[in-house]
UniProtKB/Swiss-Prot annotation:
PANTHER family: 3-ISOPROPYLMALATE DEHYDRATASE (PTHR43822:SF9), HOMOACONITASE, MITOCHONDRIAL-RELATED (PTHR43822). It is an enzyme of class 4 (lyase). The keyword Iron-sulfur applies. Binds 1 [4Fe-4S] cluster per subunit. Its EC number is 4.2.1.33. The keyword Iron-sulfur applies. One of its GO terms (biological process) is L-leucine biosynthetic process. It catalyses: (2R,3S)-3-isopropylmalate = (2S)-2-isopropylmalate. Heterodimer of LeuC and LeuD. [4Fe-4S] cluster binds at residues 352, 413, 416. It comes from Pseudomonas savastanoi pv. phaseolicola (strain 1448A / Race 6). This is 3-isopropylmalate dehydratase large subunit. One of its GO terms (molecular function) is metal ion binding.
Length: 474
C-alpha cells in the first residue's frame, strides 16, 4: 500500500463523514473572517435563530475596505464610501454581539487576514483553515489544509464548524536547486503559473517541495502558497519542518508548555511519505528562474524581465492567439515590445502576497539612496499588519521609503483590488506585488503587472521595468 501525501493526511485527520455523492464533511479548526464576506453569513444565522458553534475558533479583522491613509485615524465614521463604512461597522457589531476575537480597524494587530493569522499563531501546522477569501491557501505554508470558501459556506462553518467539500487530486510542484541572486519566492510562483497555466491546478491540491522551497523562509513559502489559486488550485501547501516550528513558537495563539511539546511531536508527521504517489508532478530548475513580470491580463501571461511581449502572429493556436491579441489591446502594448520598455505610472508594494517584513526589507534595500522616478505618479508601500508596520519603523524602513519618494501607509488590502480609495486610473500601468492582474482588478481600465517587492522598487526608481540585479550587488 502506497504512503500518504501531506494532503491525504490532513484530509483524513479532518474527515467527519464521507457521503454517497462523493462529497464529504470535514471539520474546521480555524475560521478567519473579514468585513466583505461575513455580513450575509451572520444575517443568515439570525434568520435561522442560530449562533456560531465555536466562538474560540474564529478571529476577525477588517482589511479589504479600510483606508490606508491618515483618514483611518478618524475611525469608521471617517470612511468616505458608504458601503465600505457599513461593512466595517457590521463586522464590529457582529463580533461584539457574539464575543468573537476581532482586531479592529485601529488595533495595532489589525491587518490583512492572511498576514495576521500566521502572525498571531492562529494558523498552526495540521490545522484546517477557512476564510471567505480565495487566498486562504496562504496558510498552507504551515503544513495546514487551507482554502477559501463562499459566503454561504461561511455561514455553514459558523453554524456547524464543518464544511461540505470534495477531496482533490494530488499535485507535486518540485523546485530543485539554488535560486540565483535576486530571484525570490514571488518569481518562483509566477514561473510555476507561467509553466502550468491558470487552469493547471484545477481539481488539485498542490504541494510545493524541493530544495529551493525548503530553502525559503516561512514568509517566502506563504507567498508561494498564496498564489496557488492563480495556478487553479484552491489548496497549496508546504511540509512542516524546523523553520515552521521556529516561526510559530511563542506567538499569542500558539500552544504553551506541555501542550507545545505534544504539538511539535505531532507536527513531525506533517510531511508526505517517501512512497506517496502524486497524480501529477511538475518540476522546475531553480537555477533557470529569472525575475518575472506579468505582461497581460492573466497571471499565466508572465515572462522573465529580459524577454519581449509575445507576438500573436507566432501563436498557432487560434484561441491562445485571440487571448494574446485581447490582452495586448487592453494593456496598451505592442507585439515583441521588450518588458523593459513598458512605461509605468504607479507602483504598489503590499497585499497578502508580499506585505510582510521580509518583503519590505527587500524593497527598502533597492530604494535606499535612490529616488522614485519623476515619471511615476505614485509609489505606495502598505504593510500587511500594524505589527509589521511597527517593526519596519523600528528598523527605519519607513524613512528609507519616504526619503526615496514612496508613500508609507497604514495596513490593509489597499491597491490589490479596487474596493477602497487606493486604485488605478484608466490606462495606468502599475508594477504591483499583488496576485491578480485581470482587467479592472486595481481600478477600471487599470493595467497591472505582477512582480516581486524588489522588482517593484526597482521599477519605481527606474520608471520602467529593469532587472533588479542590475541595481543591487551580491
Amino acid at each position: 500500500m502506497a504512503g500518504k501525501t501531506l494532503y491525504d493526511k490532513l484530509w483524513d485527520s479532518h474527515l467527519v463523514k464521507q457521503r454517497d455523492d462523493g462529497s464529504a464533511l470535514i471539520y474546521i479548526d480555524r475560521h478567519i473572517i473579514h468585513e466583505v464576506t461575513s455580513p450575509q453569513a451572520f444575517e443568515g444565522l439570525r434568520l435561522a435563530k442560530r449562533k456560531p458553534w465555536r466562538i474560540d475558533s474564529i478571529i476577525a479583522t477588517p482589511d479589504h475596505n479600510v483606508p490606508t491613509t491618515s483618514e483611518r485615524k478618524g475611525g469608521i465614521d471617517a470612511i468616505e464610501d458608504q458601503v465600505s463604512r457599513l461593512q466595517v461597522q457590521t463586522l464590529d457589531d457582529n463580533c461584539d454581539e457574539y464575543g468573537i476575537t476581532e482586531f479592529k480597524m485601529n488595533d495595532p494587530r489589525q491587518g490583512i487576514v492572511h498576514v495576521i493569522g500566521p502572525e498571531q499563531g492562529a494558523t498552526l501546522p495540521g490545522m484546517s483553515v477557512v476564510c471567505g477569501d480565495s487566498h486562504t491557501s496562504t496558510h498552507g505554508a504551515f503544513g495546514a489544509l487551507a482554502h477559501g470558501i463562499g459566503t454561504s459556506e461561511v455561514e455553514h462553518v459558523l453554524a456547524t464548524q464543518c464544511l461540505v467539500a470534495k477531496k482533490m487530486k494530488n499535485m507535486l510542484v518540485s523546485v530543485e536547486g539554488q535560486l540565483p541572486f535576486g530571484v525570490t519566492a514571488k518569481d518562483i510562483v509566477l514561473a510555476v503559473i507561467g509553466k502550468i497555466g491558470t487552469a493547471g491546478g484545477n481539481g488539485y491540491a498542490i504541494e510545493f517541495a524541493g530544495s529551493a522551497i525548503r530553502d525559503l523562509s516561512i514568509e517566502g513559502r506563504m507567498t508561494i502558497c498564496n498564489m496557488s489559486i492563480e495556478a487553479g488550485a484552491r489548496v497549496g501547501m508546504v511540509a512542516t519542518d524546523e523553520k515552521t516550528v521556529e516561526y510559530v513558537k511563542g506567538r499569542p495563539f500558539a500552544p504553551k508548555g506541555a501542550e507545545w511539546d505534544l504539538a511539535v511531536e505531532a507536527w513531525k508527521d506533517l510531511v508526505s511519505d517517501a512512497d506517496a504517489v502524486f497524480d501529477t508532478v511538475v518540476r522546475l530548475d531553480a537555477a533557470q528562474i529569472k525575475p518575472q513580470v506579468s505582461w497581460g491580463t492573466s497571471p499565466e501571461m508572465v515572462l522573465a524581465v529580459d524577454q519581449n511581449v509575445p507576438d500573436p502572429a507566432q501563436e498557432p493556436d487560434l484561441v491562445k492567439r485571440g487571448s494574446i491579441e485581447r490582452a495586448l489591446k487592453y494593456m496598451g502594448l505592442k507585439a515583441n515590445q521588450p518588458i523593459t520598455d513598458i512605461q509605468l505610472d504607479r507602483v504598489f508594494i503590499g497585499s497578502c502576497t508580499n506585505s510582510r517584513i521580509e518583503d519590505l526589507r527587500a524593497a527598502a534595500d533597492v530604494a535606499k539612496g535612490r529616488k522614485v522616478a519623476a515619471t511615476i505618479k505614485q509609489a505606495i508601500v502598505v504593510p500587511g499588519s500594524g505589527l509589521i508596520k511597527e517593526q519596519a519603523e523600528k528598523e527605519g524602513l519607513d524613512k528609507v521609503f519616504i526619503e526615496a519618494g514612496f508613500e508609507w501607509r497604514e495596513p490593509g488590502c489597499s491597491m490589490c483590488l479596487a474596493m477602497n480609495p487606493d486604485r488605478l486610473g484608466s490606462g495606468e500601468h502599475c508594477a504591483s506585488t499583488s496576485n491578480r492582474n485581470f482587467e479592472g482588478r486595481q481600478g477600471a481600465g487599470g493595467r497591472t503587472h505582477l512582480v516581486s517587492p524588489a522588482m517593484a522598487a526597482a521599477a519605481a526608481v527606474n520608471g520602467r521595468f529593469i532587472d533588479v540585479r542590475d541595481l543591487i550587488q551580491l
